[in-house]
Amino acid sequence: MCIRDSIPTTLPKGSTTMGKITFERSIEDVAGEVAQFTGFSQAMTYSFESPKVFDKLKLAEDSEYRKAVVISNPLGEDFSIMRTIPVNGMLSSLSTNFNRRNKNVKLYELAKVYIASDDKNELPDERVMFTLGAFGEVDFFSMKGVVEEFLERIGMKNKPEYDPAAGISFLHPGRQADIIYDGTKIGYIGELHPDVADNYALGERTYLVVIDLATVTGMASFDRKFNGIAKFPAVTRDISMVMPKSVLVGNVEKIIEKLGYEVKKIEDVK
């Protein structure tokens, strides 16, 4: 038996936990900041899509993107699956703007895709994708610049490589590339295929970038290192080289970096 008078008198107490943003959310925040800083506006599209999207994007019949999660009680066929690729919503938004006679449109989206598991009892793999889409006063290289700015902001200091043999059906065959960082594919970039552009009623050259933030998160770091001031003044030298058009600039940079030199600026003089 416990007597009330034997319970000691104390003041109420409790502990608080300081809230913080997760590392993954920090990466997303940086992606949004970089996109907005470079002139992109945020788009928000549905995660529900129609199976007709796959044909609209010219995806192969055996494409992994066709293995979608089917909704058991959809609102209709147009909302009957969960998206496996983020570009349909982006292209639909760009198409709406183009049809409203907006001549210079740059959009970005941070949204999940849902990759179905082979085991139907398991939940799908949800991956956040950073998607950029634009037409008008934009080209392949300006989109490439946004990619590199984002990677640098999240501590990925090495320059990404661009593999032109991407083989993405909805991008222009000669104007697309996988984005490779330290040997790992983190996304892709390119100009929209003309046939797909017609499917979305886009009459301008349209450019897309898709970066898998789930992959990028494992490589990113917000740690900063500072180097001491050099004892001696820097020495710079301008070097000009004449090369065939078939030589990729990235390969030239690799050779220079292997020799221990830092490339400050490369210009294409014709």
Predicted regions mapped to residue ranges:
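Short beta-strands and strand-coil junctions in structured, solvent-facing domains, enriched
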Residues: 77, 97, 117, 195-197
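A carboxyl-terminal module marker
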Residues: 4-9, 16, 119-120, 125-126, ...
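Polyanion/phosphate-binding surface patch
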Residues: 72-74, 103, 107-137
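Extended, well-folded interaction surfaces typified by the phenylalanyl-tRNA synthetase beta subunit core
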Residues: 4-103, 268-270
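Hydrophobic pocket-lining residues within nucleotide cofactor-binding pockets
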Residues: 48, 114, 216
